[in-house]
Each structure stands twice: as C-alpha cells, then as structure tokens.
C-alpha cells in the first residue's frame, strides 16, 4: 500500500490508464491530430469522426441525443453557459431565478453576476440533511420565474436531490430546469429521455477523464435556446465557439464509455467501502455525519469531529489526502458555506472532513484510514482544552469568550 492514500476523488480523479492511452492517439503527426472543423481533407474528417464517437459515448451514458451534447472547457463553463445563456435568452419572459444555497460556486457566482445585471435570484436553504424542501421550492416559483438551477449530487456532503420531481414541477409551469450533474454522472443512473431536465452540466475529470473538458446537455424536444457566451467560428451549433480539443474530447468519451460499463458494480463496491469507513468511526464520541447516508451518493462521506480543529486534523492525517470543504473553496479558511447552510455551528463546520472514494480505493486503505483517524482524534483531543472542559460538563455555548 502506497502512502499518502488518495481519498479526495470528488476534487479530481486520476485519468484511467485506458483513457490516457486513447488520448495519446490524437496528438502527434502519426496520430489523428487534425482540426475537426477542417472539412476539405482527411485529417479533419478523421478528427471529426473521433469527436462524433465521443459525443455518442457521452450521450449514451445519460440517455440523450448526441446532438444535445455541447462541448465546453469544463463544468464551470457549462454552468455559466447554461445559466447566463438561458437567462439572457428568456429574459423577456421574466427575470426571476431560483437556486439553492448549497450549489457549487460556479452556479452561485454566476447567479450573483446575473443579480448585478438586474435579475432577481431566490436562494433556497436546504433542510438540515441537505435536501431541498420541495414545498419551499414550489412556494418560491412565480409567474416571472424563468430558470431553476438545483444540482444532482452535492460535492461536499454527497446528498442527492430529487431532480425527477423538481423537473416535473418546472415543466408544469414552463420553467427551464438546469442541473449541475458534475458529481453524479457515471455514479448514479441518469436518463435524460425520462427526466424533465432541460440543461445539464458534465465534467470530464470527476470521472477518470482529463481536466479541461466538459459538456452541456441542451434539450432539443421541447427545444431549449441559450445565448452563446463565447463568440467566434460558430462551433457546436453556434452555442460555444472554439476549436474542439480532440484529444480531450476522446478522453472524456472513453471515460464515459467505461463508466457506463462499470457503474453498477463500481457503485456497489464504493457504497460498501464508504459504509465500512463510517462504521469504523461512528462509535467515537462527538462524531457527526453530515448529509444523509440513505439519500447520499455512494462515494462521499462528510464527517464532523467535534472539539478538533479541521486544519490540525488535516495536518495529523497527512497520510490521507482528504479535504475540509471542497477543493474549489478550501484555499480560504472560512468554514464551508455548504455546512453553514445546513444550520451547523462554525465550530462543527470547521471540524468537518470530506472523504471521497473512487475506482482505485481499496479495503486495505479504508482500514488504514480508520485506524489513523481514531488515533489522531484521540491525540488531538488530549491536547484540546475545549475537549477537557466538555468532558468536565462545562456548557461551552454559555461561555462569554473575550475577544482580544
């Protein structure tokens, strides 16, 4: 077993060797290096064919028509294109948007930008388990609501929203529904031929494909229109200009093909490992599960260890690659906004760790992690005056701390 152990698959995944091998064939002179938009020679035709195959592989995983898949530079761009693109196109109908407080920053900051441009955004607070209350969502819908953006799987706590029901609610009112499916695609079944979802964002690098490539699903029936955010040669049916990066697209296609084949067995395996990890730590004192095991993605476990500083815990667990919060916001020392939105105290949010498992995680690694966590928590709590006071029965919430 090699240390450190990678348990941060929700931040990124290693590229599957099968994917890397495939990508190598689309880079050099002796490979297929042409521009898929070059229509006048074989180099272009071969590149275009490779892109078509990948587009099909992505569409097949999610039950879409390949013509509904638009390539982007990643899920952040897909979120921007979906939300700004739909808001700008449909603003004559209304300027009200609904999202949730626990969305990814790529959705929240895009909505904030639209607010600066004169749109009105309602940010729903989830219930304490992270699930959106559908009655609250319904109450927030108005005649001038044009767009709802609620994610499938939360990247920090792994809870799964009921996108099927939300889609029905939106379709009944003629509201466009966007789903950020970055953390769910290839892990949970998605069938866009059944779901009433109009726009869906995908990433390559969360599912063993390369970084820097993603896609946006744009429904054809009923037809959804979006305004392009990047202008140029009119690639991707005018929705996203720019020369297509064939090697990245082929890599994403291969990753999605593998995911379709292996998803069922892989998810059962990961669910077992995640439960093994939780069962290994849940009997410790003052340990809390954030999110919901029943309504949770099989590969994410977010746990708070009370009376232990999250930063010191991460240092103590240096042999485990884990995160507090998400990689996108872990550079700031603020407690996770997702956990705060669940109504958690700053202290508890600060002591939370996200473990995310993946294709190369083994049972041996999980057992090593459990042992390390138990030892580290014990040691850090011995050093903690707060833990000592708590053990003596002092109510820490009632103490007036002096601010120096």
Swiss-Prot record:
Binding of [2Fe-2S] cluster, residues: 328
Biological processes, Gene Ontology terms: [2Fe-2S] cluster assembly
Protein name, per record: Cysteine desulfurase IscS
Source species taxonomy: Bacteria, Pseudomonadati, Pseudomonadota, Gammaproteobacteria, Enterobacterales
Disulfide bonds: none
Cell compartments where the protein resides: Cytoplasm
Highest rank taxon of the organism: Bacteria
Modified residues (N6-(pyridoxal phosphate)lysine): 206
Entry's family note: Belongs to the class-V pyridoxal-phosphate-dependent aminotransferase family. NifS/IscS subfamily.
UniProt KW Ribonucleoprotein keyword: no
Reaction(s) this enzyme catalyzes, per UniProt: (sulfur carrier)-H + L-cysteine = (sulfur carrier)-SH + L-alanine
Principal location class: cytoplasm
Keywords from the UniProt entry: 2Fe-2S, Cytoplasm, Iron, Iron-sulfur, Metal-binding, Pyridoxal phosphate, Transferase
GO CC terms of this entry: L-cysteine desulfurase complex
Cofactor: pyridoxal 5'-phosphate
Organism: Klebsiella pneumoniae subsp. pneumoniae (strain ATCC 700721 / MGH 78578)
């Amino acid at each position: 077993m090699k240390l450190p152990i990678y348990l941060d698959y929700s931040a990124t995944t290693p590229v599957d060797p099968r994917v890397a091998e495939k990508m190598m064939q689309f880079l050099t002179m002796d490979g297929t290096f042409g521009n898929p938009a070059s229509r006048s020679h074989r180099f272009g035709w071969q590149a275009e064919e490779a892109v078509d195959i990948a587009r099909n592989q992505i569409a097949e995983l999610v039950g879409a028509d390949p013509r509904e898949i638009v390539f982007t530079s990643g899920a952040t761009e897909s979120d921007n294109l979906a939300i700004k693109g739909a808001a700008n196109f449909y603003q004559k109908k209304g300027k009200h948007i609904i999202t949730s407080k626990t969305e990814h920053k790529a959705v929240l900051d895009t909505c904030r930008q639209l607010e600066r441009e004169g749109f009105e955004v309602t940010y729903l607070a989830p219930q304490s388990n992270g699930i959106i209350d559908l009655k609250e969502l319904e109450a927030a819908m108005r005649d001038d609501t044009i767009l709802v953006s609620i994610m499938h799987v939360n990247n920090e706590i792994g809870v799964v929203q009921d996108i099927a029901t939300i889609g029905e609610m939106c379709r009944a009112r003629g509201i466009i529904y966007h789903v950020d499916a970055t953390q769910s695609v290839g892990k949970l079944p998605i069938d866009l031929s059944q779901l009433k979802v109009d726009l869906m964002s995908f990433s390559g690098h969360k599912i063993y494909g390369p970084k820097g490539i993603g896609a946006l699903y744009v429904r054809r029936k009923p037809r959804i229109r979006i305004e392009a955010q990047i202008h140029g040669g009119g690639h991707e049916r005018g929705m996203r200009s720019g020369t297509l990066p064939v090697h990245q697209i082929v890599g994403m296609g291969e990753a999605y093909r593998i995911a379709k084949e292996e998803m069922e067995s892989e998810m059962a395996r990961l669910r077992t490992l995640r439960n093994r990890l939780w069962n290994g730590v849940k009997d410790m004192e003052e340990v809390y599960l954030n999110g919901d095991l029943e309504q949770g993605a099989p590969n994410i476990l977010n746990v708070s260890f009370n009376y232990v500083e999250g930063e010191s815990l991460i240092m103590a667990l240096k042999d485990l690659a884990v995160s507090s919060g998400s990689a996108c916001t872990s550079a700031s020392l603020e407690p996770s906004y997702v956990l705060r939105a669940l109504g958690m105290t700053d202290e508890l949010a600060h002591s939370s760790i996200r473990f995310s498992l993946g294709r190369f995680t083994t049972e041996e690694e999980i057992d090593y992690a459990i042992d390390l966590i138990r030892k580290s928590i014990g040691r850090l709590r011995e050093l903690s005056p707060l833990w000592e006071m708590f053990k003596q029965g002092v109510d820490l919430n009632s103490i007036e701390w002096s601010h120096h």
